Amino acid sequence: MKITQEEVSHVAKLSKLAFSPEETAEFATTLTKIVDMVELLNEVDTEGVPFTSNVAANINYMREDVAQPGWNREELFQNVPEKERGYIKVPAILDDGGDA
């Protein structure tokens, strides 16, 4: 299945990423190769192979929930480039401000 440069550009735009035309072409080629390799799995005969949902033997090991002291706010904020009313201010990712 061929992944086009237009598809890569579309996903990049949705992700707020910018790539050069050369990078977009390289991503399209690489993603096409990855999808082709995954599609090879459809050719594997899995008849009679039991369904596997978890390969790890560790299931739901729980520990006691113990409160621990947090970080010193002033010390953390020394590395923050921009803050507002006690919160870290980050660039907006929604053009219209969103529905929140």
From Swiss-Prot:
It is an enzyme of class 6 (ligase). InterPro entries: Asp/Glu-ADT_sf_sub_c (IPR036113), GatC (IPR003837). Its EC number is 6.3.5.-. GO terms for biological process: glutaminyl-tRNAGln biosynthesis via transamidation; regulation of translational fidelity; translation. Keywords: ATP-binding, Ligase, Nucleotide-binding, Protein biosynthesis. Pfam families: GatC (PF02686). It catalyses: L-glutamyl-tRNA(Gln) + L-glutamine + ATP + H2O = L-glutaminyl-tRNA(Gln) + L-glutamate + ADP + phosphate + H(+); L-aspartyl-tRNA(Asn) + L-glutamine + ATP + H2O = L-asparaginyl-tRNA(Asn) + L-glutamate + ADP + phosphate + 2 H(+). It comes from the Bacteria. One of its GO terms (molecular function) is glutaminyl-tRNA synthase (glutamine-hydrolyzing) activity. Heterotrimer of A, B and C subunits. Allows the formation of correctly charged Asn-tRNA(Asn) or Gln-tRNA(Gln) through the transamidation of misacylated Asp-tRNA(Asn) or Glu-tRNA(Gln) in organisms which lack either or both of asparaginyl-tRNA or glutaminyl-tRNA synthetases. The reaction takes place in the presence of glutamine and ATP through an activated phospho-Asp-tRNA(Asn) or phospho-Glu-tRNA(Gln). Belongs to the GatC family. HAMAP family: GatC. This is Aspartyl/glutamyl-tRNA(Asn/Gln) amidotransferase subunit C. It comes from Streptococcus sanguinis (strain SK36). The gene is gatC.
